[in-house]
Amino acid sequence: MTIASSNGSNRAQSPLITDLAEAINTRPDRNTHNGREPELHQPSEEDMESMMGAVRSILVGVGEDPEREGLLKTPKRVAEAMRFLTSGYNQSLEELLNGAVFDEGHNEMVLVRDINFFSLCEHHMLPFMGRAHVAYIPNQKVVGLSKLARIVEMYSRRLQVQERLTRQIAEAVQTILEPQGVAVVMEASHMCMVMRGVQKPGSWTVTSAMLGVFQEEQKTREEFFNLIRHQPAFF
């Protein structure tokens, strides 16, 4: 069994999946068309100008003056922030992994817990943020520990709903490693529930995705849940 934080691994590279590019581009989830990731373009300067214009319109719409001193640079700042917060659209698993898949012969649970993340709700474009716990039971192959955190980050930096985000992370790990099973739990606070709507600060949403042995075997699920509840003594 391996338990880690979101720190990286220094193993020597030994890529195993030769057709990874094809494998990771074909996953059935709600962001795909016919099982394939949609074609997305890199944001251009024209796109930036369009976003800046949209922000100016919003400022006018709420009764503000976009020409006053404090707001002069706001459209550009918001556009740059949105580009960063949605940068996961312009990343791929193939580039993210960079060959960091290794044949270790390990067959006990690997868990990286307490991965901090932030994302944007696709309904209101307000933030939600929290912690992710990602585990898998290898079938010979393992991945650099930091890559699990980067997978969480890549899918989080898109317009999301927490349920889909949880499932996408689990399916990504399943695709790249073909392990015996994958488990993902995400705990998050949603600003669309805190700042508007029901206005309930302190509420948390918990979602899970279980694949393979984590779905099929209660004992394996219980081990995972016990590990993510346990507080490490050395912190």
Swiss-Prot record:
It comes from Nostoc sp. (strain PCC 7120 / SAG 25.82 / UTEX 2576). Its EC number is 3.5.4.16. It is an enzyme of class 3 (hydrolase). PANTHER family: GTP CYCLOHYDROLASE 1, GTP CYCLOHYDROLASE I. The gene is folE1. Keywords: GTP-binding, Hydrolase, Nucleotide-binding, One-carbon metabolism. Residues 26-47 are annotated as: Disordered. The lineage of its organism: Bacteria, Bacillati, Cyanobacteriota, Cyanophyceae, Nostocales. Residues 27-44 have a biased composition (Basic and acidic residues). This is GTP cyclohydrolase 1 1.
